[in-house]
Amino acid sequence: MRALERAEVGEVSGRSLLHLQCHVGIDTLSWARLGARVTGVDFAAEGVATARSLAADIDPSAVFVEADVLALPDHLDGHFDIVYTSHGVLGWLPDLRRWAEVVAHFIAPGGFVYVFESHPAAWMLDNRLDTAELRLRYSYFGEPEPLSFEYRSPTAVPDREVPGVEYAWGHSLGEIVSGLASAGLTIEFLHEWPFVAWRMLPCMVEHDDYWWRLPDGLPSIPLSFSLRASKPPA
C-alpha cells in the first residue's frame, strides 16, 4: 500500500472497508494489516480463491466475495465506512453511473469512497511507441462500444502463449465525478498526479518511490488522479 493512498484515506483502524475489484486481495489485506475490517469483491473466481488463501495466513477475518461489482447489492449486505477502488479498474466497467450508484449504496452515512486511478487523459496516448515521445491514439470521451485489445498470455509450457482479446471502456474525468455527485455524494477533493502505478508507456521510468513517470524532456501531464467523495451523516 503506497504512502500517498494511506495519507489521503487516513486512519482505518477499527473501520469497515469495502474494496471493489480487488483482484487477488493484496491491497485489501494491506488495509487489513493497518487495522481495517475488510471485504474484497471481484468477479474472477480464481482471483477470489487466491485472496481467500492469502487471507487464511494474514487475516482470517477478511471476507472475499465473487460478484460483478455492478450487481453487488444482490450479493452483499451491509454498509461500510470506506469504499476503496484503485489502479486500472474503471475501464473494465461499461456503466459508470450504475457503478456510482453501487458505491453510494454501500457507503455508511458519514463514510466516503476513495478512488486512485489512472487519468483518462493518459489513456489517450499511443502505447505502441518505443521512443520518448507522446502521440494521441484514442478518444478522450468514451464510446458506446468498447475498445478491443489483442494480447498473448504466457502458459506453463515454455515459449508457448495463448492469444486472447480483452475489452475496455473509456470514461472521462467529468463522467466519473458527475456520476458520484449524481449518486448523492459530496466531492471532498480531486487531485491529479504526474505519475502512475505501472508502466503505461514503454518510455516511462520507475523512480525510487515506485511510481512510473515520463522521462525528462517530455511535457508534464496528468497520469493518475485521486478522488474522495463522502455521504452526508444521517
Residue ranges and their predicted role:
Residues D81-R97:
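A short SAM/SAH-binding and catalytic strip from SAM-dependent methyltransferases
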Residues S16-L72:
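Class I SAM-dependent methyltransferase SAM/SAH-binding core
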Residues R97-F112:
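A short glycine-rich, Lys/Arg-flanked "PGG" loop and its adjoining helix->strand segment in the class I
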